[in-house]
Amino acid sequence: MITDAFLQEVLLNPKDHDVVATLNLNVDYASDALAAQVGGIGISPGANMSDEASIFEATHGTAPNIAGKNIANPSSLILSAQMMLEYIGWTEASYVISGAFEKTLKENKITEDLANQIKGCEALSTSDFAKEIIANM
């Protein structure tokens, strides 16, 4: 399937594409597009898996333009760590993190990047958002 048709297909029918194997450049486009459906690249977790090794990481970049400003959204990294814990069989720890994360969002406490998109939410700094998640554990 060519890339433009694939991008349309995954956006219209994301549940039909739980696993995608493609070249790195194509998956970069697809991951950005699909991340938009769940809040953006700041919230979407990332994993690279093989039979021999797996890496769990935030989905994109280092954002040098916001370094040191305490405004980065740590959700992608937190959810990647949660996914890693589930993958290695530490399900209880995984559930604690995902439950605390979900509770924090339900309390309408989110980072600035998402608060700009959702009315009625409290915009928190990176560190305050992390503290709220920890408090909900």
Predicted regions and their residues:
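Glycine-rich phosphate/nucleotide-binding loop
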Residues: 9-109
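Glycine-rich phosphate/pyrophosphate-binding loop and the adjoining helix
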Residues: 100-137
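Active-site nucleophile and cofactor-binding loops and adjacent substrate-binding regions
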Residues: 3, 70-72, 122
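Short acidic loop-to-helix transition motifs that present clustered carboxylates
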Residues: 1-8
